[in-house]
A protein has these predicted regions:
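N-terminal glycine-/serine-/threonine-rich phosphate-binding loop
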Residues: 1-39, 48-57, 71, 89-110
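Conserved small/polar residues in nucleotide/adenosyl-binding loops
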Residues: 112-114
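Glycine-rich, flexible beta-strand/loop modules in the N-terminal catalytic cores of phosphate-handling
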Residues: 71-91
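Short glycine-rich or small-residue beta-strand-to-loop segments that form or flank ligand, phosphate
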Residues: 37-43, 83-86
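Short internal beta-strands
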Residues: 65-70
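A glycine- and small-aliphatic-rich helix-loop capping segment at beta-alpha/alpha-beta transitions
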Residues: 53-64, 78-82
């Protein structure tokens, strides 16, 4: 591999690492402080990975959380989280059930919780 190709590959590899959901969430939350416990809601194809990153970084700061992701995108349990999978790109009954779990998780929140 010539030197230009090596440099290009290094740039590509580093860029891809930076946009990975786990790394992006950890970068976004690093240094954040919360006055109390927080609730984490993660939705989408990368939701499980993002929630796991938040859990890894924030630990006991998280009171609870809900993940709603596409079928077969969950990689197992995350302590304190409800994991729900649903249809994508078409909504199905499990998508709706997952959305209801999210609504239940936040229904008693008010502006004081923000």
């Amino acid at each position: 591999m010539n030197i230009l190709r090596e440099h290009a590959q290094t740039i590509i590899d580093d860029t891809l690492k930076q946009v990975q959901p786990h790394a992006a969430v950890q970068r976004a939350l690093e240094g954040c402080t919360f006055p109390g416990k927080c609730i984490v809601i993660a939705i989408g194809k990368a939701a499980w990975t993002m929630a796991k990153a938040a859990s890894d970084l924030l630990g006991n700061t998280i009171d609870h959380g809900v993940v709603l992701t596409k079928y077969d995108h969950s990689q197992g349990e995350i302590p304190g989280f409800i994991i729900a999978e649903g249809g994508h790109p078409l909504v199905d009954e499990n998508s709706i059930a997952g959305t209801e779990k999210i609504l239940a998780a936040v229904e008693n929140l008010s502006l004081i919780h923000i």
